A protein has these predicted regions:
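Short, non-helical or kinked segments that cap or interrupt transmembrane helices
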Residues: 26-40, 62-74, 88-102
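Hydrophobic transmembrane alpha-helices of multi-pass small-molecule transporters
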Residues: 79, 104-105, 130-131
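Amphipathic alpha-helical interface segments
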Residues: 91, 105, 123
Length: 148
């Protein structure tokens, strides 16, 4: 993979992260927004690129397993997501934000292995769940909760 293709994938990571971040910051009003999501997606992409390409031609490395970096991304983003989950007056807050940060890292990993169509479709699905499903929950479940 040449530099231009890597730069294209990293740029797409920033773009797709911003798309999800815009929904979280400006539509949902959450504190984790465009910069956070763009950086999570970018970081996941670049670490995946490193795991794929960074050790090519290194024949003296024993037990090289590129999937270790992918596993590290999942764990690291889980730790980041745990930082946004809080307990406030017996109510857990931040679960959706944590899950969306974790999902966006998957988008970045998909880009890192070159699955651009999957990354775009995944981004669409994340925004759909956050925006449309969230709106439906507020509209119908919120009304149901007020009545009971």
């Amino acid at each position: 993979m040449d530099f231009l293709r890597s730069a294209e994938l990293l740029s797409l990571a920033i773009f797709l992260g911003i798309v999800v971040g815009l929904e979280r910051e400006y539509i949902a009003g959450k504190s984790a927004g465009t910069r956070t999501y763009a950086l999570v997606c970018f970081g996941s992409t670049i670490f995946t690129l490193i795991s794929r390409l960074g050790f090519l031609g290194e024949s003296n490395l024993q037990n090289l397993d590129p999937s270790r970096i992918a596993a590290g991304i999942v764990v690291g983003i889980g730790f980041l997501g745990a930082g946004v989950i809080i307990l406030h007056h017996d109510k857990v807050l931040g679960l959706t934000t944590a899950a969306s940060i974790w999902s966006v890292s998957g988008i970045g990993m998909a880009l890192g292995v070159g699955w651009v169509k999957i990354a775009f479709f995944g981004t669409f699905l994340i925004v759909f769940v956050l925006g449309i499903i969230g709106w439906l929950e507020k509209k119908f479940l919120g009304k149901y909760q007020k009545e009971n």
